[in-house]
UniProtKB/Swiss-Prot annotation:
The keyword Disulfide bond does not apply. Pathway: Pyrimidine metabolism; UMP biosynthesis via de novo pathway; UMP from orotate: step 1/2. Orotate binds at residues 121, 149. Its cofactor is Mg(2+). PROSITE patterns: PUR_PYR_PR_TRANSFER. GO terms for biological process: 'de novo' UMP biosynthetic process; pyrimidine nucleobase biosynthetic process. Belongs to the purine/pyrimidine phosphoribosyltransferase family. PyrE subfamily. This is Orotate phosphoribosyltransferase. It comes from the Bacteria. It catalyses: orotidine 5'-phosphate + diphosphate = orotate + 5-phospho-alpha-D-ribose 1-diphosphate. Disulfide bonds: none annotated. Its EC number is 2.4.2.10. Keywords: Glycosyltransferase, Magnesium, Pyrimidine biosynthesis, Transferase.
């Protein structure tokens, strides 16, 4: 799947939004990719997961024991990646601010885990979710995501990173907003509390 085909999937789902958005990282953007909208169509979600799975090296796919994703945003694509790879898929969640396994999910000691996210911007949620996996005895061997939104900042997740598409929409600190954003109220569309 080419980058243009991937973005066409987002456009077809009305998931490429334009406005003034406050991202979970605390930065502002004129554009937002609402992955929940692109993933609500099960056939589209399956196509995107299959394309993402195809980006992984064969040796890595063979080594993976389990797919883990952080709730909320990663749950659907994590499940679809599990399906595409023929591996079980679970998720971590943060009921009190720290990711943890719940709902009876367990990770076998030493299990090779693929972390799967919808969007990675700073990598903070990914690193926090990886800590929960390690605390439960798993070994995170790589991360995959639908969208790398890091704008070429070379985020360090500590493991190989395989995004389906890299999008470099400009982001701004609150005190660096361009005039077209400064005059409008920001909408916070994500599921995580905004970083301080």
């Amino acid at each position: 799947m080419t980058d243009d085909q991937i973005l066409a999937e987002f456009r077809a789902a009305d998931a490429l939004l334009q406005g003034h958005f406050l991202l979970s990282s605390g930065r502002h953007s004129e554009y937002y990719l609402q992955c929940a909208r692109v993933l609500m169509d099960t056939e589209r979600a399956g196509r995107l997961a299959a394309a993402l799975a195809a980006k992984l090296p064969r040796e890595l796919k063979q080594a993976i024991d389990l797919v883990v994703s952080p709730a909320m945003g990663g749950v659907i694509i994590g499940h679809e990646m599990g399906r595409a790879l023929g591996k079980p898929a679970i998720f971590v969640e943060r009921p009190t601010g720290t990711f943890e396994l719940r709902r009876g999910f367990t990770i076998d000691p030493g299990a090779k885990v693929l972390m799967v996210e919808d969007v990675v911007t700073t990598g903070l949620s990914s690193r926090e979710a990886m800590e929960a996996v390690r605390a439960a005895g798993g070994e995170v061997v790589a991360e995959a995501a639908l969208v790398d939104r890091s704008a070429g900042s070379n985020i360090d997740l500590g493991v190989p990173f395989y995004p389906l598409v890299a999008i470099n929409f400009p982001t701004y600190a609150a005190d660096e907003l361009p005039p077209e954003l400064a005059g409008t109220e920001a909408i916070k569309p994500g599921s995580r509390s905004v970083a301080a």
